[in-house]
Amino acid sequence: MTDKAPQKTHLNIVIIGHVDSGKSTTTGHLIYKCGGFDPRALEKVEAAAAQLGKSSFKFAWILDKLKAERERGITIDISLWKFQTNRFTITIIDAPGHRDFIKNMITGTSQADVALLVVSAATGEFEAGVSRNGQTREHALLAYTMGVKQLIVCVNKMDLTDPPYSHKRFDEVVRNVMVYLKKIGYNPATIPFVPVSGWTGENISSPSQKMGWFKGWKVKRKDGFTKGQSLLEVLDALVPPVRPANKPLRLPLQDVYKIGGIGTVPVGKIETGILKPGMTISFAPSGFSAEVKSIEMHHEPLQMAFPGFNIGFNVKNIAVKSLKRGNVAGNSKSDPPTEASSFTAQVIILNHPGFIKAGYSPVIDCHTAHITCQFAELQEKIDRRTGKKLEDNPGLLKSGDAAIITLKPIKPFCVERFFDYPPLGRFAARDLKQTVAVGVVKSVEHKAGAAARRQVQKPVLVK
């Protein structure tokens, strides 16, 4: 392979939504229609699904590689699949919908360029998904927090509305979802709403005869409007993300594997910079350094990996147990990542039943890391719209408040200023099985021995 990036732009799409909204089935059908599956493999899966009485999960089953997942009927970890459209090479991240698996869902979102929110139009199912405890709301909020600017809404299970393929029901679902997405911060005019049936395949790759009333989706872009009919047309109309290849390397690890005959293979998505075989890289917060022997993406060797690539790479002389999910890899010779002893952030409290005081210690989800951090100091309460200071050293914070706070990680943690490396500088704070706050990192105090770098960033306006 040459040192040039492949001609088709890479896009990472995370599939989000409430459990049983039909995410895996819709995704599986989409990949199937785009030729991403071997027909013979599909026949085997169909036979196995029929044997277990799960024929209705056929396309979802294609995505459920793990045996444990098949038996439990829930997508647990994040599955990665690849297919081609006319314009893009798309990697699908199929994220779990069960509340218990929200941590995996956050990890998937942090890797994505685009979120495809699947909502069920089936009677009762939509209402459950958007209820206060449903995941539709939380997933959409997390996607926005993690910086996923492009969102597609797939109104699924149109074959199960009353009557089937109901125009009225589609409009009702769209109206409800639009209100919530606007509250989060998305502009509904930029979001395509597409009616589909993941099970029958209606309107996935070509316009549906059963939904003649659907005149197509239309979205606003900087250069005018874009429109189309099917879900596949939406994917081809996406705006390619700007990839910061000229910044130093930052690669948060998603997992680390030991592969027989090869050795230690960390995997993850390059957020910034470029990775090449022969490069010496450092991992933070673990502190280890190693040489990159080889790089692979979708089982193909690469001589250069660019931002947005989901890759696996082999490193020399480093044990699997020395690295783990949440470590960040960087070029040892160019602004390598380091462990944070504390960091200052601008946060918005979204959902806490009481008051938050100094000492509060939620789990912070940032890039692929999940680390408990203490709200060590509440520095100032600010106006969430203007960023102006309202109060110094507030005694407590409640839902709706915005503040500048200092956080101290309980375990080793690598974060960056949002200004320098956005994907490593935005986070969600979780407690009580829900997202209690979201924030952006303004400055980082690096652990003794790490180079003291960078000045404090100006307040970031969070809408």
Curated annotation (Swiss-Prot):
It comes from the Eukaryota. Residues 197-199 are annotated as: G5. It is found in: Cytoplasm. Residues 17-24 are annotated as: G1. Residues 94-97 are annotated as: G3. Residues 156-159 are annotated as: G4. The 42S RNP particle comprises four subunits each of which contains one molecule of 5S RNA, three molecules of tRNA, two molecules of EF1-alpha and one molecule of the 5S RNA binding protein 43. Belongs to the TRAFAC class translation factor GTPase superfamily. Classic translation factor GTPase family. EF-Tu/EF-1A subfamily. NCBIfam families: EF-1_alpha, PRK12317.1. This is Elongation factor 1-alpha. It comes from Xenopus laevis (African clawed frog). The lineage of its organism: Eukaryota, Metazoa, Chordata, Craniata, Vertebrata.
